[in-house]
Amino acid sequence: MLLELARWLQQLESLFGLFNYLTFRGILAALTALFLSLWMGPAVIRKLAQFKGGQPIRQDGPQTHFSKAGTPTMGGSLILLTVTLSVLLWGDLRNRYVWLVLAVMICFGAIGWYDDWIKIVRRDPNGLKSRWKYLLQSIFGLAAGLFLYYTADVPAAITFYIPMFKSIALPLAGVSFVVIAYFWIVGFSNAVNLTDGLDGLAIMPTVLVACALGVFAYASGNVVFAEYLKIPLIPGAGELIIICSAIAGAGLGFLWFNTYPAMVFMGDIGALSLGAVLGTIAVIVRQEMVLVIMGGVFVIETLSVIIQVASFKLTGKRVFRMAPIHHHFELKGWPEPRVIVRFWIISVVLVLIGLATLKVR
């Protein structure tokens, strides 16, 4: 929105040419989302607190979690609102990737909102029935995959790449591309949701991964950097740095209120939408496997649930004391802040490894 105004004003004053730089607008997007979150946060939390009872607590969970009863949830609505406003202000609204990612965020956020609403109003910790949740996620995930396939304007946009092996590039047919896009979008949506079980546990890795994806998006959309780093050139992908920056700013603003002990929980409205956005951006910039590395915390949390369920069904025994795995460490006696910070440290290391693949090729 403001970009169009700046382009017009540039004819009168060359200083407005700064707005043509993605990095400059990325910084503004992050700061805008951050300050909006800090400013609007208290009012949003007070509004959410009107839903008496807050987030339902699992009866079979760690005993320390019962003190969280009554904490407002659906705080992810603050993230979605500030990200959307920031992107609309600083993003190039003629870019199809911007609108696709915003649409994915809003659609998956709507699923999460309804899931949270059921948990709060009906006092049902399970929320929306799994089959309906996965059906809606599948519809939106497949729609995003189809959109990306049929609007691809360069072969690189529908080619599968393996990190660190620049000679491996697998062209994808329609079905294979859409299936991969579906699994990454829906998979990471649920992976972030599974991780969101402790105060601040999910949002910090999300911020870190978003920042790293912003680097990949910027490089992928730049002819010089893409050629130098031997990564796929995706015209228009650079604009996604605005969304990544907005997520980083909004995420840090939300963490101000979500840090231990949390004043508000993100809820499914935030976790499902942010995970889907990370998956979508990774698919656009053709860095699906790098996302698996950088989002390793989300992957580990998901695998712990899969292993736990499979083991119990096959052998009647549990591998972990409780899944997702962050609860396992809680039940081993780790204080919640220790679990959170150590998972953050792991996330930092994994993101740095992911960024290193830019040169190790």
Curated annotation (Swiss-Prot):
The keyword Mitochondrion does not apply. It is an enzyme of class 2 (transferase). Pathway: Cell wall biogenesis; peptidoglycan biosynthesis. It catalyses: UDP-N-acetyl-alpha-D-muramoyl-L-alanyl-gamma-D-glutamyl-meso-2,6-diaminopimeloyl-D-alanyl-D-alanine + di-trans,octa-cis-undecaprenyl phosphate = di-trans,octa-cis-undecaprenyl diphospho-N-acetyl-alpha-D-muramoyl-L-alanyl-D-glutamyl-meso-2,6-diaminopimeloyl-D-alanyl-D-alanine + UMP. It is a multi-pass membrane protein. InterPro entries: Glycosyl_transferase_4 (IPR000715), PNAcMuramoyl-5peptid_Trfase (IPR003524), PNAcMuramoyl-5peptid_Trfase_CS (IPR018480). One of its GO terms (cellular component) is plasma membrane. It is found in: Cell inner membrane. Its cofactor is Mg(2+). The chain crosses the membrane at residues 25-45, 73-93, 98-118, 139-159, 168-188, 200-220, 237-257, 264-284, 289-309, 339-359. Keywords: Cell cycle, Cell division, Cell inner membrane, Cell membrane, Cell shape, Cell wall biogenesis/degradation, Magnesium, Membrane, Metal-binding, Peptidoglycan synthesis, Transferase, Transmembrane, Transmembrane helix. It comes from the Bacteria. One of its GO terms (biological process) is regulation of cell shape. One of its GO terms (molecular function) is metal ion binding. Its EC number is 2.7.8.13. NCBIfam families: mraY. Belongs to the glycosyltransferase 4 family. MraY subfamily. Catalyzes the initial step of the lipid cycle reactions in the biosynthesis of the cell wall peptidoglycan: transfers peptidoglycan precursor phospho-MurNAc-pentapeptide from UDP-MurNAc-pentapeptide onto the lipid carrier undecaprenyl phosphate, yielding undecaprenyl-pyrophosphoryl-MurNAc-pentapeptide, known as lipid I. This is Phospho-N-acetylmuramoyl-pentapeptide-transferase. It comes from Xanthomonas oryzae pv. oryzae (strain PXO99A).
